[in-house]
């Protein structure tokens, strides 16, 4: 199977798609472009096979998550493409464009939310523990690896929180402060803003 990967900024996607159509006859196209619906492309050409894929940046380490939506790929070809993306991490198949938009805002953008949060850890450790940046980042990386392993083995986030937060202990104090400052609502608003923007991009084309 020969496929063409469409991986450009949304503002350049339609022109790039038209160039692909000029140079390939009935191409098999996998779009990595955020926001733009399959129907937007298919209106320009309904003979090509087309699907959307939305990986996140951890794919380059083989630990990514990729959402796939099959618009018009033959089933056998879709399976082959899915197999390719599975080499870069977990693959999730969704059944409509809207779910790709949701995935983009939550999982596609997800690493940046964690990185932003971890900057607070980095800043605090460097200031209080007098450690250099390299050591602090190694500590944070191992912290996140441990979190990931805990989720894989247990899975229940409430149980994992209870296992760390002793009554009247340091973790409980920290969690109470985060809750009183509406951390969950802040994250919810951030996720909703990203999903909204993904849908706005879709409506621009």
Regions from the PLM with identified roles:
Residues 34-36, 55-59, 107, 142-144, ...:
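Glycine-rich beta-alpha junction loops
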């Amino acid at each position: 199977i020969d496929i063409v990967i469409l991986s450009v900024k949304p503002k350049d996607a339609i022109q790039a798609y038209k160039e692909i159509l000029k140079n390939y006859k009935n191409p098999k196209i996998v779009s990595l472009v955020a926001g733009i619906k399959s129907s937007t492309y298919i209106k320009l050409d309904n003979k090509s096979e087309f699907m959307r894929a939305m990986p996140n940046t951890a794919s380059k380490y083989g630990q990514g998550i990729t959402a796939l939506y099959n618009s018009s790929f033959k089933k056998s070809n879709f399976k082959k493409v899915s197999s390719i993306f599975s080499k870069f991490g977990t693959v999730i198949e969704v059944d409509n464009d809207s779910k790709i938009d949701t995935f983009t805002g939550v999982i596609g953008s997800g690493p940046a939310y964690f990185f932003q949060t971890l900057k607070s850890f980095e800043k605090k450790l460097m200031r209080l523990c007098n450690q250099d940046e390299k050591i602090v980042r190694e500590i944070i990386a191992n912290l996140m690896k441990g979190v990931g392993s805990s989720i894989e083995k247990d899975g229940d986030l409430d149980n994992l929180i209870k296992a760390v937060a002793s009554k009247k202990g340091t973790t409980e104090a920290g969690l109470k402060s985060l809750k009183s400052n509406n951390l969950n609502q802040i994250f919810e608003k951030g996720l909703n803003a990203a999903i909204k923007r993904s849908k706005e991009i879709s409506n621009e084309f």
